[in-house]
Amino acid sequence: MPVFLHTRIRVGDLDRTIAWYRELGFECVRRIPRSPQGNQLAFLQIPGSAHVLELCFQPGYKLVVPEDLMHTAVGYPDLTAKCAELEQKGYAIWPADWRQTFPKGRRMAFVTDPDGYEVELLEQG
């Protein structure tokens, strides 16, 4: 049976992006200073999750992330507490009505990473 292992995104500043995703609960589990293609790589993972987010920085590459290209999703047992924590740190949580309950009783919100990738925050439980 196949297993979904990782998702790779390009980033404009590897250290800045690692720090940003740490605020969401990710840990940097591995770094490669220079791949055979000349990229700097970091592999992030939420403890207990099998999926890995691979960050790829290529010196000299002009990063442009088209709006609504893709998003990742992270679940939290207390979405209100996580969003309040992020807002206190200056993160913009959207849409404005994220506190409403959506179909099937769940709530969701979004936050945008430093390069423009959207991260969906889902209430779990």
In which residue ranges do the predicted regions lie?
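Short glycine/serine/proline-enriched coil/turn segments at secondary-structure junctions
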Residues: 35-36, 62-64, 101-103
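Short beta->alpha transition motifs characteristic of CBS
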Residues: 30, 121-125
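Active-site beta-strand termini and strand-to-loop segments that position acidic
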Residues: 44-49, 111-114, 124
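Residues that flank catalytic or metal-binding motifs in active/ligand-binding sites
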Residues: 3, 40, 51, 68-70, ...
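Core segments of cupin and vicinal oxygen chelate
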Residues: 2, 8-50
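Arg/Lys-rich, alpha-helical DNA-contact motif
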Residues: 49-53, 64
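Vicinal oxygen chelate
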Residues: 12-15, 67, 72-118
